[in-house]
């Protein structure tokens, strides 16, 4: 007499037997996806986006004890707020009063001032820092004893430019720490996500060559369970290069939108800048990462056109560029006045992109990216932007 669990198949119709078998298979599959022990999550970074992502992860860790350890660690660069350590404030008041004020954080989110202590024992490292700090962060993390099969997700926006080309920051993490790394990017303004206003994002992750198996290693199921919330919907794809490039280059485009807003040129001009920017982003991917990206990532995913639209509708880069246009001040001056110690990533990314294009003699192939660089760092005026990017018939 054949049984599945407590079910007696001999007393069932063929259709009922098939349903029972399928249900049993799905139950076994679900159980196989549960890890042998809960995964530990650590967030590297505690700015407004870093703290927001840590909030999301801690909420899910609290809800899914079969998958994740209850406590999520967040590495915080220690600083004093009215004479009190920021980590102490976060751990006692459950609020990042400097970078995400007014948002209550889960009690299982623990602020840790030691980056080595925060990283050791982690199964998943989530990097969320200004990208120019990554080399120093990796140098510090090289002193930590990381788990043999720790995995990572990069929420960083930028590129590593070398004389020979450019690398994804996820690749930089892998090369310097030996940690397989994916990427997260999407139409996600941190204050809106922190306030639990509905949005979506894209996680890009390919299974590593040394994948240990479901239930033993981080996979798409685990990543979606870690990041997906009712107010923060997640799609997991494999195009790490496309997601990373879209996340980096949209900040350069947003500077252009900020410039035209500062001159009160209107929505038509802002839309034109975004069209140029999307086209140059796709072209950049084709030139520097041939065969590694999927054009659908730029046109159909949250990490692509949706993030471009959102970033160009507000955010740091637009604010900084708009203030530059209105006041005539430099990017450095405006950043210092507006951003409370944070940075507009488009400023440094535009310089990195220019250096790469100049080294490859390709500046004329990317007129918008080059024009924005020349306005920020060179002698060009914002008023000449239409002339600088004008297309031939």
Curated annotation (Swiss-Prot):
For this protein, the parts annotated as crossing the membrane are none
Q: Residues that bind NAD(+), according to the entry?
A: 45-50, 133, 157, 190, 316, 345
Gene Ontology BP annotations = carbohydrate metabolic process; glycerol-3-phosphate catabolic process
* Enzyme Commission number(s) from the entry: 1.1.1.8
Please give the GO cellular component terms listed in this UniProt entry. Answer: cytosol; nucleus
Instruction: Give the first-level EC class, as a single word.
Output: oxidoreductase
Q: Which reaction does it catalyse?
A: sn-glycerol 3-phosphate + NAD(+) = dihydroxyacetone phosphate + NADH + H(+)
Where is the catalytic site? 250 (proton acceptor)
Which residues hold substrate?
Answer: 157, 316-317
Q: Where is the signal peptide?
A: none
Q: Which domain of life is it from?
A: Eukaryota
Q: Which Pfam families match?
A: NAD_Gly3P_dh_C, NAD_Gly3P_dh_N
Q: Name one GO molecular function term.
A: glycerol-3-phosphate dehydrogenase (NAD+) activity
What are the UniProt keywords, alphabetically?
NAD, Oxidoreductase
Record family assignment: Belongs to the NAD-dependent glycerol-3-phosphate dehydrogenase family.
Identification of the protein by name = Glycerol-3-phosphate dehydrogenase [NAD(+)] 1
Q: What organism is this sequence from?
A: Cyberlindnera jadinii
